[in-house]
Amino acid sequence: MDGKTYKLRASCNACNESKVRCSQTKPTCARCERNKTTCVYGLSRRTHKDAPPISLSHSHSHSHSGSQPHSHSGSRRSSVHIPNATATANATTTANYTSTTTPFMPLHENSMTSYPPQPSVDQFFAQQQPHHQQPSTAGPGPGILSPANLDLPSFMTPLPTPNEDHTNSLFSSFGNFAAGVGGVNGSVNNILTPLTGSPGTGTSASTSTDMFQQPQVQECTCHAGVMEQMASMSQPSRNEERRLSLDVQLSQLKRCIIASEASMGCGHHGNGDSEPINIISVAMLIGRIIDEFELMLNERIGRGTTMPERERSLSLDEATISIREPRLCWGVLELEDDDEVELRQRLYLLYFRKLERLLSQLNVFVRTLHDSRGGSCNPTFIMACEYIHLWLEKKAEGVKRLFPAADEYTGRIPS
């Protein structure tokens, strides 16, 4: 037009016609002319920055473009200074157009969902800033979508980055929650905190000690020996091939008697509101003791042994002594075999007398239970204890008949 070469647009905004020539007198591309379509944006906005917006009608655009045919050079020279009304309209048009095509709108939507940190947003705009600094062909003026014009903090509120303060606040919140649970249970702080009287713990050493004192008062080990002895008297010992020697058997019977006496003499029976179930375990252990005596007597003396057959039982005991069991001795005194057999039989009788005394203690315990706890204790339980004691006495009397007349020398065995 005035001897200068103008750059060509990439395409027409109305029909995507390539290489639309910038012409002040002919602002229509060839395709729009063939299709008889209004081509308002045929002019390049690099040299025709005051072109009418798309919202204006075609008549207004022609009148606006026709009113300035002779002042094209002046408008081109003063294209930097755009009137306020036209600049406002162009900014509105550009904002409406970029609302559907600009890639920056999904940016704040993604930020609301994935919460990117602020430095990544600045880095993204720093990469896009050279494109905005150049004259744009899709909007009026540079820097419309620059970070300076976009008020990102107004519509983007990212979550705080997990730093040290955030972590401390998180654990402090958890501590408050644990403190609240401790207030409900009343013992969490005492369990998690050492039992000291330091300030700030909320408890004192005496309070914590009182809390754990109650289970210690109720603990009782008087009945543990009964259960231990019942477990030690295993069934395989009844086999003759695996029978224990005399000293081991008598030691085991002695421990059982001591454990039963300790259980019946226990004073931790409570306030009388429950039955002493331990007496059933004691009765079971006494029954096992009687069975052991019966096995020993049947093995060494023989069932139904009478006085004329005593010599035969002594010979059997001599063979047993020489094979399996240790010999009895008293210092430098050497015992004969028959003397040793007599001493062994008296040891049997001695421990059996201890068993009889244990049965007498059981009888006293049951009578005391009947007299002192008759009102609070279950009568059925008391009756069961009485029947168990009666059965044990009858069983012990049957075992006592297996002994030979050991009291023919002395009327009683000294205790």
Curated annotation (Swiss-Prot):
Family matches, as CDD domains: GAL4 (cd00067)
Positions of region (Disordered): 50-153
Disruption phenotype: Leads to complete abolishment of the production of flavoglaucin and its congeners.
Name recorded for this polypeptide: Transcriptional regulator fogI
Biased composition (Low complexity): 80-102, 123-135
PANTHER family documented for this protein: MONODICTYPHENONE CLUSTER TRANSCRIPTION FACTOR-RELATED, OLEATE-ACTIVATED TRANSCRIPTION FACTOR 1-RELATED
Organism name: Aspergillus ruber (strain CBS 135680)
One annotated GO molecular function: DNA-binding transcription factor activity, RNA polymerase II-specific
Name of the gene encoding the protein in the UniProt record: fogI
Keywords: DNA-binding, Nucleus, Transcription, Transcription regulation, Zinc
Superkingdom to which the source organism belongs: Eukaryota
SMART domains associated with the record: GAL4
Main location class: nucleus
Keyword Zinc: yes
InterPro entries given in the database record: OAF3 (IPR050675), Zn2-C6_fun-type_DNA-bd_sf (IPR036864), Zn2Cys6_DnaBD (IPR001138)
DNA-binding interval(s): 12-39
GO cellular component: nucleus
PROSITE patterns in the cross-refs: ZN2_CY6_FUNGAL_2 (PS50048)
